């Protein structure tokens, strides 16, 4: 994965994880999963609800936070947050 992708993904997913924001994750096949992001890496997201599910990022279409989230791309990029 390119560094540019990580400049957006990592701070966004990390803010969702840190703030325990409830999310809806839509998969490419249309299935909707709900829960809180427990952890993530380059390839997967761990989604916790009544159980913890490992969801492969290539299967994710959209992640919708349950509330507004403030995150900064500067967390990952230092002072150069330009895309």
From Swiss-Prot:
SUPFAM superfamilies: Sm-like ribonucleoproteins (SSF50182). One of its GO terms (biological process) is regulation of RNA stability. Pfam families: Hfq. The keyword Iron does not apply. The keyword Calcium does not apply. GO terms for cellular component: cytosol. It comes from the Bacteria. This is RNA-binding protein Hfq. It comes from Delftia acidovorans (strain DSM 14801 / SPH-1). The lineage of its organism: Bacteria, Pseudomonadati, Pseudomonadota, Betaproteobacteria, Burkholderiales.
């Amino acid at each position: 994965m390119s560094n540019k992708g990580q400049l957006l993904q990592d701070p966004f997913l990390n803010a969702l994880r840190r703030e325990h924001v409830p999310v809806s994750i839509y998969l490419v096949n249309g299935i909707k999963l709900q829960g809180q992001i427990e952890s993530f890496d380059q390839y997967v997201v761990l989604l916790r609800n009544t159980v913890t599910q490992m969801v492969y990022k290539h299967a994710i279409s959209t992640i919708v936070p349950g509330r507004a989230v403030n995150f900064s791309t500067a967390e990952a990029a230092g002072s150069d947050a330009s895309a």
